[in-house]
């Protein structure tokens, strides 16, 4: 089976992409296009011209424009009418043709929710499906239409994933930030399994079963990996801080910073939670949840065991060592 290795890369990350990176990836998601006045806006992607070089390095590389991201609004209003959906889909087609892209990825965070302080509507549930229908009709069967989805029961509740799965090429599970800025308990934000005593359902195995049971075929599921950490302060020095009451999970540090400044330095000790199949750092009061090479490898092996499509990660620039991408490529044999 040919597995996918999909990397999200922001505009700022594109100048640092190397030939070796391009050859290890099967897909690159450009982050992000936005919605402005109901149409696709790509004005912030100033380095998109570099993608032609990426194709020369790897002619098989699929380059997909991802639209949305955390705090990106405009989806609900645009998707409310058939006219709005068609106009947006047409603007996506024009961008795909202009920049020689392979498709469109939708990262709507989240339908039916104003959690990210964006517009929402109860009709988002049905309109989410209709948006993908409009994109498929505009882009045709030979271009990629994909989605990135929140890793929780709320996303399944607020969408029609069984219908969406019939339209899109694949569904990317954002199996990170499962513990986040709204969580006040130190724990793993991207773990494969659950820690002993953790009953929160914030682990990849649970999320895969959740979306599969909601109607997404395993062969269309892509598991997410995090190239960054979340840290919690004020945790009690019990069980190395794991599952202790703490501050909310704050973004950072990136994996590159972990390798340079935190791992076995600055008072931090690295630990492995075998139950959760996840790594973390602890210094007596600060708990840092991150994905180590072994954690990434186990996610990749899990993908292979379950017959899923592959692994994607956020975000390319967060690991300048390229150690984690190397683990993905080696385990999934993408290079």
Region spans (language model):
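Substrate-binding surface in catalytic domains of secreted glycosidases
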Residues: 36-46, 90, 111-260
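Glycan-binding loop/region signatures in secreted carbohydrate-active enzymes
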Residues: 67, 225-302, 331-335
